[in-house]
Amino acid sequence: MQKEIRRDDIIGSRRFSNYFWAVFLCSGGISFLLAGISSYFKINFLPFANPKELAFIPQGLVMSFYGTLSIALAIYILGTLFWDIGSGYNEYNKVENLVKIVRKGFPGKNREILLTYPLTNIRAIGIKISEGLNPKRSIYLCLKDERQIPLTPVQQPNSISNLEEEAAELAKFLDLKLENL
């Protein structure tokens, strides 16, 4: 029975890089906001600097703006970490003849995203590799109606050999051809 069902877990937003950026933006944002407030009230709120000597307009105002923006972005990233946005699984079920793609979204009516496709509607497994400044290496589910559904999570790009091996295993499991997109 286990040879008829394959399940690949997907790590969502709970990656080290997101924790790093949340802490970095939060600490930097608080520091900038306190520096801006210190320059306005002429009271030093930072133990490691003396921002009360800064002119509030324009330096203190700009630092307050950047601090507020940074804290807002950190709160957004912490929200994605808390709700584990993007996590889920891909299930390939030969018994039910279905492919299920499940992901967590933001709270609301679409909190859980469920995509279900019959195996008969799947044309191939596709690999898309684009190099450059922002390289992307992904595996896609190619449907007969020409849609391409991404299967790989957002992360640092895998090596090309690992990506090809993973795609070949999946294509072999589903008895589908492998395409280069």
From Swiss-Prot:
Lipid bilayer topology: Multi-pass membrane protein
Keywords: Chloroplast, Membrane, Photosynthesis, Plastid, Thylakoid, Transmembrane, Transmembrane helix
Family: Belongs to the Ycf4 family.
Bilayer-crossing regions: 19-41, 61-83
InterPro entries reported in the protein's UniProt record: PSI_Ycf4_assembly (IPR003359)
Lineage: Eukaryota, Sar, Stramenopiles, Ochrophyta, Bacillariophyta
A Pfam family annotated for this UniProt entry: Ycf4
Top-level taxon in the UniProt lineage: Eukaryota
Protein name in UniProt: Photosystem I assembly protein Ycf4
